[in-house]
């Protein structure tokens, strides 16, 4: 029987070697898989860090540019406001000057017209008194004193035009 046991032992020996080899290979594969996993995790972390850093730099750049645009816009708006204010002031001054000139012209016209109207009124009054006296004289209603006072007022074109 010893030979059967020897054969059995010798037959199991390669199987044991195969199992041991398989175990060693499995352990080696596990180690390599773990190393690959660690390497991938490390690379992913590094990529994430670079992405965050890049995002921060980009955000800072965009923020700086946006601030510069905002500042430039404010400056432009302020300049436009100042220009408009200056134009408004000039327009107000010009309108005030024109209003004052119109007022002076109106006053001068009023004075001139008033003088003409006063002169014309005096002439009409004188003519009416002359006509009244003439009618009284015609009908003999005038007294002796009034007959001597009768005067004739004439209106000529040159006296009506006083400038």
From Swiss-Prot:
On the tree of life, the source organism's domain of life is Eukaryota
**Name recorded for this polypeptide:** Late embryogenesis abundant protein Dc3
Write out the entry's keywords from A to Z: Repeat
In the record for this protein, the sequence repeats are positioned at 32-42, 43-53, 65-75, 76-86, 87-97, 103-115
Q: Where is this region: Disordered?
A: 1-117, 139-163
Could you tell me which cysteines form disulfide bridges?
Answer: none
Q: Where is the composition biased (Basic and acidic residues)?
A: 28-56, 67-84, 91-113
Q: Per the record, which residues fall in region 6 X 11 AA approximate repeats? A: 32-115
Sequence similarity? Belongs to the LEA type 4 family.
GO cellular component terms listed in the entry, alphabetical order:
nucleus
Here the segments flagged for biased composition (Low complexity) are 152-163
């Amino acid at each position: 029987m010893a030979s059967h046991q020897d054969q059995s032992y010798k037959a199991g020996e390669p199987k044991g070697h195969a199992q041991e080899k398989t175990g060693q290979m499995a352990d080696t594969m596990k180690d390599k898989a773990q190393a690959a996993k660690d390497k991938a995790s490390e690379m992913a972390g590094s990529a994430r860090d670079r992405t965050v850093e890049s995002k921060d730099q980009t955000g800072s750049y965009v923020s700086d540019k946006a601030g510069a645009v905002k500042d430039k816009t404010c400056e432009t708006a302020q300049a436009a406001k100042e220009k408009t204010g200056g134009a408004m002031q000039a327009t107000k001054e010009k309108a005030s000057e024109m209003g004052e000139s119109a007022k002076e012209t109106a006053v001068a016209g009023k004075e001139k017209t008033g003088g003409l109207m006063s002169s014309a009124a005096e002439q009409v009054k004188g003519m009416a008194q002359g006509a009244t006296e003439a009618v009284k004289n015609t009908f003999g209603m005038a007294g002796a004193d009034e007959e001597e006072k009768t005067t004739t007022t004439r209106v000529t074109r040159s006296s009506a035009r006083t400038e």
